[in-house]
Amino acid sequence: SYQNYEIIIVDNGSNDENKSKYAELCKKNSAKYIYEKMEFNFSKMCNLGVQKASGEYYLFLNDDIEIINNEWLERMLGQAMLPHSGAVGAKLLYPNSTKIQHDGIINIENGPCHAFLGYDDKNIYYFGRNRLTYNYVAVTAACLLIRADKFNQIGGFDEDLRVAYNDVDLCFKLVEAGYYNTVRNDVILYHHESLSRGDDTANKEKMERLMREQARLYEKHKKLAKYDPFYNINLTQNAIYFSLNRSYSEVLCNEVKKSMKEYKLSGSII
């Protein structure tokens, strides 16, 4: 497995006991430990880590990600090395499960959503979207690899997006700069989602913060407001599974029926 890396842990509020454990762990593994007590701000924590990083590539990895295969980093790095590549993401499954938690982000009518969320990865979906390498408008920063100069070119994470949509904003900036964000479906990890910070929809306060951050995202990226250049306009705009838009599919069926009648063919359209 890939060995040429450094580890940087950014901690925003551990107690003294856990701080000591982290410090000892970092000492044993030649890792860097950054402690700054503050209210949770994912963007600021990532940017702090970058300030201490010396590599040519940055991997942002949540503390609730579990590694379950050996070649994941090499595969992501190989993709990130391509000149047109922006952010590289992974397929994330729920722990000890084949249910999909993340397989790319689509930006549809309801806002940015995880494609195939909750779907069983045992099945193959829309043109192998959960099997092959595909471009998406965004990927989650729970596991995101990017070349350092590209990250710095677009200004890193927006620290005004403290909790949600900071990764989407980063990816939108990459798209606007001409890069392509990608999900590598041959990189599969477990994600113990929101184990540390909790659910974004747990109460009214969190919901209001979530809506404010979405509003900021679309204010910054007006051309990408509920528009996804990597998502076919003939697909439904309010679901996550790449099904045909009802009105389009009805038109398509009628055209097929018309052709069948013209050529005197029999059969059923499903």
Region locations from a protein language model:
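A short, conserved alpha-helix in the catalytic core of glycosyltransferases
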Residues: 72-76, 135-155, 160-190
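Conserved donor NDP-sugar-binding/catalytic core segment of glycosyltransferases
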Residues: 65-110
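Short aromatic/hydrophobic "clamp" motif used to bind/position activated sugar donors
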Residues: 58
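Acidic donor-binding segment of Leloir-type glycosyltransferases
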Residues: 1-38
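Glycine-rich, basic loop-to-helix element that forms the pyrophosphate-binding segment
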Residues: 36-53
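Active-site acidic Asp-centered loop
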Residues: 12, 61-63, 158
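C-terminal, non-catalytic tails of nucleotide-sugar-dependent glycosyltransferases
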Residues: 86, 96-97, 108-136, 145, ...
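Active-site donor/metal-binding and catalytic loop motifs
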Residues: 69, 177-179, 184-202, 216-217
